[in-house]
């Protein structure tokens, strides 16, 4: 995660507007307090105001490679999940050419030209989908070690006049998926993916600022009620589908790593999933880690950064031990959602 911490007090000087451009009636203090109550967010991380997205990716990947302990040129696949490409310095927009995976491969100095490097645009579930694709590549014999990256620099994409700008944050998470996990019957047990893309296709989108004097048409926008309804309905269902494929139930799972959109949504995931299985509520303290209070919503980087915190013992009360079954589940723009059952 970036080192730059942004507390909620940072936004007290902001003028938040309604979609029609009128000023919100509540004071900034009351508005921010209400958002904190609903989302649970107290702070988030932003990258420095200088530079682009590449240093954030490179640092996260270098940390992953150091933990892996093998030659970086043994990486024969790179998949980068993101939402808007390389976010340029300041607010100069973003580039998708060359693609992020190519920029990352160049920055890391990986010389193996057999190492494919491509991006996926799949909203917040992009990193989980990247892990699924890496698994396929390994099963097909196309790769042995795939670097899967989820990167988000939302601080350059948000509308500063939109209250939702307080929710999103920056981050990058990385995992190296290797053939030995597949061969040893560890790693991915099962997975499921839904892509609806019906009336919900524009629940999350890019559009103009609520400040009519701004001309940038590529700022993050969200219909929060539609997103909440979709997520709380379909994430439990896609988890059940993945568990059914593995012959498991929610009671067999040791930990659930959910996309961290807001605290209220996490409780709804647990409640709805428990109802589907007819079991008592899943304890947020026991099986469902919460990081949104200090990370914000880092979109596609959420699950890998949360996993890293747990594996490194940096998230109090949570530990992943060998043999544990963990569900990764995410939801985002499209609308898409997915779930993956992983055995450590």
List each language-model region with its residue ranges.
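A contiguous, well-structured pocket-lining segment that forms one wall/lid of small-molecule binding clefts
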Residues: 216-292
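Acidic, glycine-rich active-site loops and adjacent beta-strand->loop/helix elements
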Residues: 81-87, 121-126, 150-155, 194-195, ...
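Conserved catalytic cysteine-centered active-site region
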Residues: 28-52, 87-145, 275-305
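Structural signature of cysteine-dependent C-C bond-forming condensing enzymes
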Residues: 67-76, 109-115, 138-151, 183, ...
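Conserved beta-ketoacyl condensing-enzyme motif
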Residues: 50-121, 248-267
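Short, well-ordered amphipathic alpha-helical segments that serve as non-catalytic structural scaffolds
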Residues: 30-31, 54-68, 100-102, 230-245, ...
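Condensing-enzyme catalytic core mediating Claisen C-C bond formation in acyl metabolism
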Residues: 1-50, 161-233, 237, 331, ...
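Flexible, glycine-rich active-site loops centered on histidine and acidic residues
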Residues: 139-172
